[in-house]
Amino acid sequence: MQTPLEISSVVFKPILIRAVVALAFGLTTVFVAEPGLTWMKVMFALYLAFSGSAMWEYLRRDPVPVAMRSPLSLAAAAWMLGVIVLLFLGSPAVVGVAAGAALVLGGVAELVAWARHRREFIPARDQLWTGLVGLLSGGGVVVAALQGFGPHALLGIAGGGAILIGVLLMVSGLGFHHEVRRDRGTARGL
């Protein structure tokens, strides 16, 4: 059994990587005023691909319980499959449904990981919030796509969820990083 400090020293980097990916996507959706279909496909594909890669980097780390790796692998796989599907779609509505479905599946998988492992693995507690936000923002994208909303609205819904996930994971990752630095005697400031 590893101590919380040993776990923190291993998981903070992939958590911070996923936070940066989510924040970059979310902020991009805020500042691009007139995204077209191609921009929407590229942005969703990049977000899903880099989120899946960051999740894979996280779940393959030694302290992550082996049983927790299955649902997190499903989340990463749903996001990567979403990237492949997006390549073949040609309308904002269908792209929105596909991207939203990938976010929903990833969110459900994260909620399963949280429900099964929150007591034994402290970082798994983040999966409650990332899973809920993924589920709700993905569901929002699907509903908006089916109602005929355009790329700006669909990216905005997903981007809002990404900003929430990014901020949560940034706080979590920096907290784990600070614990490690404090124990090593290298923490400065607060």
What annotation goes with each model-predicted range?
Residues 35-50, 90-105, 156-163:
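Structural signature of hydrophobic alpha-helical transmembrane segments
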Residues 23, 49, 56, 80-81, ...:
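Hydrophobic residues within the alpha-helical transmembrane core of Major Facilitator Superfamily
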Residues 81-131:
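Membrane-proximal helix-loop-helix units in multi-pass membrane proteins
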Residues 64-77, 122-131:
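Cytoplasmic-side transmembrane-helix entry/capping segments in multi-pass membrane proteins
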Residues 123, 149-160:
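Loop-to-transmembrane alpha-helix initiation sites
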Residues 1-65, 149-150, 174-190:
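N-terminal topogenic module of multi-pass integral membrane proteins
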